[in-house]
């Protein structure tokens, strides 16, 4: 998406994934941790004036609550099963009152939730038979509320280990 935005003249020097992976325009948008560390070390070296790495993220807002649940897929063909779960979630979320599917998303299904002042992202892991579920909310108890609703949907899939969501109701 960052490449497309830049081609349209939108200044987009960095692409970030929910997992924390990042890619810089000046490194051809390669997901390169060594390059990122080199950039951070340069900033540390420049910090001789008393500034520090934390200053780079001053002003970024943090949600009141945030949680990641890592849901294991127990089916042998975990990739196809995960794709099915995401497809069904996309269909379900599009019809559910108070849920708004984020159209410009490239990592699974992201849904904004009215009332919880938050959102969730459910996606496939790139490497493991996992479906990470990230939830953020700006109201007390919002993560729990969103997780309970998502779990209600996921209960229909016998090929998911919903243990990480146990205790949510």
Label every PLM stretch briefly.
Residues 1-134, 139-169:
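Phosphate-binding and adjacent anionic-ligand microenvironments
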